[in-house]
Regions:
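Juxtamembrane membrane-water interface segments that cap and precede transmembrane helices
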Residues: 42-60
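Multi-pass membrane glycosyltransferase architecture that uses lipid-linked
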Residues: 1-37, 41, 62-229
Length: 229
């Protein structure tokens, strides 16, 4: 997809948000916008499953929020550079290649994307891992937030190189931590350890080849060469 196509897709996503919010925007626009997009909101420490072991006065501090935000963005950048864009020469090389041949803004916006089809596995991996990194770095996770990533845990665990027994144990540990009510410092610390262990497994696993068409072509050529031999 070209940059113009990405921009139009983002406009479409924003349009859906506007359409869904029309009843509230018409009746209470200021209240809706200020509450729906309140990025400075702090959830109640008592109900948090994540980072419950952190004392409340530090839990609600801006220092912790900023620290987690920096770790979140840094981890996303590291995964993008060394894992998701590895076969493109890294994130920065990929971005540079998009600007390198453009002589004007108009040419940059309208440039055609390369004819490369990403594999389904790569797309799902990037989306699930990116979401999981956000879960790991979330200061407060209430019980309903488990639905954000529960469905992706089996996929993520099987993207690691851990033995199957370890994968199952990690899945059970995460499930048990979320079923402790109310959460305790120990269950919260154990959940964070399990999350970090899974994240380490995802990081240490080899970067997959992202393109489906080239992979299929290579597989086909290898099969044909095998038959010829």
């Amino acid at each position: 997809m070209s940059i113009k196509g990405v921009f139009l897709a983002l406009l479409g996503a924003a349009g859906v948000q506007v359409l869904l919010g029309i009843p509230f925007l018409l009746s209470h626009p200021v209240e809706y916008i200020s509450r729906a997009f309140n990025l400075g909101r702090v959830f109640i420490h008592f109900w948090s499953v994540n980072f419950k072991f952190v004392p409340e006065k530090y839990f609600v501090s801006k220092e912790l929020a900023i620290g987690l935000l920096i770790f979140h963005l840094t981890t996303l950048m590291v995964f993008a550079h060394f894992k998701w864009f590895k076969h493109e020469g890294g994130l920065f090389h990929f971005v540079y290649s998009r600007f390198r041949d453009a002589t004007s803004i108009q040419q940059l916006i309208s440039c055609k994307p390369r004819q490369s089809i990403l594999s389904k596995e790569h797309i799902v991996t990037v989306m699930f891992v990116g979401n999981f990194i956000g879960i790991v770095c979330a200061r407060s996770l209430h019980y309903q937030f488990y639905s954000w990533y529960f469905y992706s845990l089996p996929f993520l665990l099987w993207r690691t190189q851990f033995p199957t027994v370890v994968r199952i144990i990690l899945f059970v540990v995460v499930e048990l931590c979320w079923n402790v009510y109310p959460s305790t410092s120990y269950s919260s610390l154990l959940l964070l350890f399990a999350h970090l262990f899974i994240l380490f497994g995802l990081w240490s696993s080899p970067a997959e080849y992202p393109y489906a068409n080239k992979k299929e072509k290579a597989d086909r050529e290898s099969k044909e060469s095998g038959k010829a031999m």
